Amino acid sequence: MIEMNNISYIKGNILHGGNIPRILIHSCNCNGTWGGGIAYQLAVHYPEAEKIYTDICDDFGSELLGKCVLIPSFSDDSLLIGCLFTSVYGGSSHDTKNEILKYTKLSLMQLSLQLENNDSCIDTCLSEYNQLLISNIKHHLKDYKLEMPKINSGIFNVPWEETEKILKELKPMEFTVFSI
């Protein structure tokens, strides 16, 4: 494992985590599709979570930009899925690099507030989904380890170093980044 300030790097499959409380963070679109990259893998492994994600996107669309929504995995009590809404659309229609980076920072700042306040829903527009998370959460949010792949660097085509710079600015948050 390589450590850089508040970021640790691990080689391995992020989907094969242990039984520790963890939030698997990924960047996603507001269009309701987990169709590629890590999002596709999440859809395959956690179809109930994808259904909640799709419902949230159907209800709120682009209002989700810059927000973080925590969704239970429904199959692993120790795993929450942290959806960072960083682009309106996915695939080749994704937003610009600068927009994606801006919304990444905003959504991670919101996640920080959620962890600090043990509140799964800072944004009142998403309050109806709050109860779902509360009924499925087994630990205080601050006790969850933050894990992610190299977000934004796949389908969104943002150089990892630019997202990494944002993560470094978000101390005291600590991230574990997985690569294969």
Swiss-Prot record:
InterPro entries linked to this entry: ADP-ribose_metab_enzymes (IPR050892), Macro_dom (IPR002589), Macro_dom-like (IPR043472)
UniProt-annotated binding residues for substrate: 12-14, 27-29, 34-39, 151-157
Domain Macro residues, every copy: 1-180
Coiled-coil spans in chain: none
SMART domains: A1pp
Catalytic activities: ADP-alpha-D-ribose 1''-phosphate + H2O = ADP-D-ribose + phosphate
Keywords: Hydrolase, Protein phosphatase
Record carries keyword Hydrolase: yes
Record function comment: Highly specific phosphatase involved in the metabolism of ADP-ribose 1''-phosphate (Appr1p) which is produced as a consequence of tRNA splicing.
Annotated PANTHER family: ADP-RIBOSE GLYCOHYDROLASE OARD1, PROTEIN C6ORF130
Protein name, as recorded: ADP-ribose 1''-phosphate phosphatase
Origin species: Vanderwaltozyma polyspora (strain ATCC 22028 / DSM 70294 / BCRC 21397 / CBS 2163 / NBRC 10782 / NRRL Y-8283 / UCD 57-17)
